[in-house]
């Protein structure tokens, strides 16, 4: 097909780690890039976000329990025209499991051909020492090699989907419970947490819908008075004991 002229990067990044990884990857393509922040309830986004056939979609998401975020309608606005996309599944040094496969299938259903996938490591939201500082300088040559391979794959006619690991039909695991609480003395009721919650799990009374909450901690990161707290002591100890060894960035491209 004709050469790619630009990048469109759609990302979900409550803590900022996935966005940073997406920006670092997009810089490797050497093309103009437009960034679309999907870290909000899908209803707040345009009904349709078209992506031209000569644009490469970079879909960037964090991994929670082996899949992308469990947010109804996430990325559903993206509309492909048979053009290429790549999936970036950022994870906190444990495993990305089925995230690439599941996201690739969704994008196929929305009109894209997934020509590649990459799984960089970013700081774990519950155990920040895992993936601290990553992606780092050691990861950049890997990002560059992936970008070169993707651009070459985009010249195939027709485009060929990459073989990505994982099972899009695997059952989702329940999220590990965290001790979520709000310090009512610190809280000034500014409503910022309600506005930034990407899952729509907080109402105006600051009540949490536990069925919707994905433990992304966007509320905690956004709170100007540090009123929201998550007790991740047990989860952090388990992760640090079993998953502290540095993992390499893995990528796949046709």
For the regions a protein language model found, what residue spans apply to each?
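FMN-binding flavodoxin-like domain, especially the glycine-rich phosphate-binding loop
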Residues: 2-9, 13-40, 46-177, 231-254
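Iron-sulfur cluster-binding cysteine motifs and their immediate structural context
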Residues: 182-183, 188-214, 218-235
